[in-house]
Design a protein with these regions (language model features):
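Histidine-centered, transition-metal-coordinating active-site segments
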Residues: 1-88, 93-101, 142, 151-157, ...
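Short, conserved acidic/polar surface loops in the N-terminal third of protein domains
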Residues: 126-129, 189-191
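Active-site alpha-helix of zinc metalloproteases
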Residues: 114-115
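Short, polar/flexible loop-turn hinges at active-site or ligand-entry regions and domain interfaces
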Residues: 145-147
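A glycine- and small-aliphatic-rich helix-loop capping segment at beta-alpha/alpha-beta transitions
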Residues: 127-142
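Short pre-active-site segment immediately N-terminal to the catalytic Zn-binding motif
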Residues: 99-110
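Short active-site segment of divalent metal-dependent hydrolases/proteases
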Residues: 118-126, 235
Length: 413
């Protein structure tokens, strides 16, 4: 009988040679596939076709939570406007920019793609504002229970999703790149730190929960991770300005008219990529010229003043989302403790056959702290789901009635 699916020894030898050629073509500073470290050492199915980091990307893409990128805020919420960037598009931009840099430097593009596509999986609804509000709830909830105060950060939660909630068995290189991706602070040079072990990685992860400043000290453990970290900033620096215009907020766009790196998104991206390459070819670190670094730092600083910290843009988050998130956290935690099996924390989360099983022991008893469960559930929500569950639970109908979305034809009415 003809074998349709299994490779012959000759075919396997060819595929193995392809994989070895891939590693041989990499820069000496790249992360070769042969050095990938996976906690569960079992080789993935079809490992000869899907090398370690290629397999990581598949695990991320097929993660049940990956779809939710599509309705998670990048910067602008409360707009019925499909031209505004959502988290799903942002991670694709990061991946493309990082792979452009990585290709020229002969880095491992498969590792770059895995880190880039998975780096924001732990983001909450309503972007960084939602992240800070959920952290408030988590701190208050753990402290109220007599536990050490714990903090929420989206990069740490991305790792928790892959390690604890859905147990994707990603490589240590991918996980460390995701954990250390936060690029809110511009650096002129990005150099990787030693990789370490999974035990050391877990200690680092726990320290991030307990010390609110510790995550700022993290550095990626591969040059590929460094590229993704810088590409994250490149991807949003100009794009967030572009979205400001697309949101009809031209009156707020008070930016410098001329910059060394450009003022249009396409110029910012292109110029930064070129300068990084000029300074990083045959280097063990990722670098920029001092003048370019300073201009990027100033541009991002302008974004904070004009966009991220604008009082009018932030008002709906602080006036509506923040109190709703605190109310939702308290309600779901109370439902858990009362074992109210009709609550969405059970029906929509813990009863899920995939993610729910990792909160229980062999006898199906819940063994996870309620604060962790509620934090995980809220972090997994999209913007729309968050509003819908608040309405469903009638958390504050008066507050919800104040919520306004900018519609497509508002300017024509």
């Amino acid at each position: 009988m003809k074998n349709y699916f299994d490779f012959t020894p000759e075919e396997e030898a060819y595929l193995q040679e392809v994989n070895e050629d891939f590693d041989r073509a990499l820069s000496p500073y790249a992360a070769p596939n042969r050095e990938a470290v996976r906690e569960n050492g079992t080789l993935p199915r079809n490992a000869i076709v899907r090398p370690p980091y290629f397999y990581d990307t598949d695990c991320i893409l097929h993660n049940p939570l990956y779809n939710r990128y599509a309705d998670k805020t990048q910067v602008f919420s409360f707009y019925r406007n499909d031209d505004l960037t959502r988290r799903a598009l942002h991670v694709q931009f990061v991946s493309k920019i990082a792979r452009t840099i990585g290709r020229a430097l002969r880095l491992n593009l498969e590792l770059i793609e895995a880190i880039a596509l998975g780096h924001d999986m732990g983001h909450t609804p309503f972007g960084h504002k939602g992240e800070s509000f959920l952290s408030e709830c988590y701190q208050e909830g753990t402290a109220a229970d007599g536990l050490p105060k714990r903090y929420f950060f989206h990069n740490v939660h991305s790792v928790r999703i892959f390690r604890c909630i859905l147990r994707s068995n990603l490589t240590l290189q991918t996980l460390s790149g995701i954990l250390a991706h936060n690029g809110e602070k511009v650096c002129r040079e990005y150099a990787p730190s030693p990789l370490g072990t999974f035990e050391e990685f877990d200690r680092t992860l726990e320290q991030c929960y307990l010390d609110p400043d510790f995550h700022k000290t993290l550095r990626p453990n591969t040059l590929e991770g460094c590229v993704v970290r810088l590409s994250d900033m490149i991807a949003y620096a100009g794009k967030d300005r572009q979205d400001l215009y697309r949101a009809g907020l031209i009156s707020k766009a008070k930016f410098e008219e001329k910059r060394l790196i450009g003022t249009k998104n396409r110029d910012i991206v292109s110029n930064l990529i070129n300068n990084i390459l000029k300074n990083s070819i045959r280097s063990s670190s990722i670098n920029m010229d001092e003048e370019v670094f300073e201009d990027l730092r100033d541009l991002v600083g302008e974004n904070y003043k004009v966009i991220y910290e604008d009082e009018d843009l932030n008002r709906p988050y602080f006036d509506i989302v923040r109190p709703l998130m605190h109310k939702l956290y308290a309600r779901l935690k109370a439902d858990l403790q009362a074992r109210d099996f009709s609550s969405p924390v059970f029906t929509h989360y813990l009863n899920d056959r995939i993610q729910g099983r990792n909160y229980r022991d062999a006898d199906r008893r819940i063994i996870t702290d309620p604060n962790d469960i509620v934090t995980d559930f809220i972090a997994s929500m999209t913007d729309d789901y968050f509003i819908d569950i608040c309405r469903h639970l009638h958390l504050d109908d008066e507050l919800l009635s104040q919520l306004r979305y900018r519609e497509y034809f508002d300017d024509e009415n």
